[in-house]
Amino acid sequence: MVRVTEVVHTKKHHKHKKIPKLISSRNLFKAVEKNNIAGTKFLLEHGISPNATHPNDSIEYKSLHWIISKNGELIEIEVGIDTPLHIAANNGYTTVVKILLENGAFINARDSFGFTPLHSAIISSYKLSSIKLLLEYGTSLTLEIIDGYYRGKTPVGLLKKIGSKKDKKVVALRALLELEKLYRNKELDKIVKKTYIKEPHIKDFIKWKIEAEIPKFIKSNISFLNKHIKKNYLLLISF
């Protein structure tokens, strides 16, 4: 007769035997792709690098950047290997982005075309939640794409290339990136003192809001920005 304790022991032993097979960079990519927060944490806690690159024999986890002609025809596909952070940022999985960054993911990791996670977040329908978080963690605003159709484009340059000037989300995102750049370069005081900003109350309000919390301000004041940026900040956002 087999005792219950022996069955439990056998199951536990069998379970532990399977765990090493689950701990792999391939499964980290799968967890990130599915926005599996618990799975991502588990794999990172068990030693999988947040900077792993997926084996290049699987196109499923490669970055796909496509160029579509005016008539909607697909005319070119570019393929480069992503990191988990590229995938999380590209999909707007903010919690997973944060987990990866907190566990040592390289915030400015480059795929084979030179896309950083910020570039990936921008090109994928302007994932604002990912962009905000990447900015908070200090992602570069000056790194350029090194190959392909978008070669030489910084994050702002990429947004100019793919975004419509009439899209309020694009206008707000341009403002966010440009203002963040000015803020980092400590040039904000110079900008708000320019004479082309005529209304003192707007000048003070803008400065206070930007210094306090740029991303939240941009997200909650899209209509304000759309109106006043074009009127008062043509030197800052040059369409």
Curated annotation (Swiss-Prot):
Signal peptide: none annotated. Gene3D superfamilies: Ankyrin repeat-containing domain. InterPro entries: Ankyrin_rpt, Ankyrin_rpt-contain_sf. It comes from the Bacteria. It holds the Pfam family Ank_2. SMART domains: ANK. ANK repeats lie at residues 23-52, 80-109, 113-143. Keywords: ANK repeat, Repeat. This is Putative ankyrin repeat protein RBE_0489. It comes from Rickettsia bellii (strain RML369-C).
